[in-house]
């Protein structure tokens, strides 16, 4: 993949998620045809119960955990041939 241009897609969001939703989203990012060649995704979003959900994803593995409260949710996706429109739909933005 050395010849592919790596870009990043980032958004701030007040959208509320469940831990299950975040896990499903991260699993979906493995679909290269749909979303692009995703190398990394990370961020923090507000959880349904008022907690904050932090997530990290690299191809083949991801982690979802709770963490310190933040002012606003932030999502960052890094990869090649990123389909921004499909990412916005996936994250419900």
Regions found by a protein language model. Give the residues of each.
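Conserved nucleotide- and phosphate/pyrophosphate-binding catalytic cores
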Residues: 73
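C-terminal accessory "lid"/substrate-recognition subdomains
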Residues: 1-70, 80-93
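Flexible loop/N-cap segments at domain edges
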Residues: 77
């Amino acid at each position: 993949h050395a010849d592919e241009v790596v870009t990043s897609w980032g958004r701030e969001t007040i959208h509320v998620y469940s831990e299950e939703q975040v896990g499903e989203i991260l699993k979906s990012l493995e679909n290269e045809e749909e979303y692009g060649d995703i190398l990394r995704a990370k961020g923090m979003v507000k959880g349904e119960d008022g907690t904050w959900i932090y997530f990290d994803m690299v191809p083949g593995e991801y982690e979802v955990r709770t963490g310190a409260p933040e002012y606003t949710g932030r999502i960052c996706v890094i990869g090649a041939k990123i389909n921004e429109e499909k990412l916005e739909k996936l994250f419900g933005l």
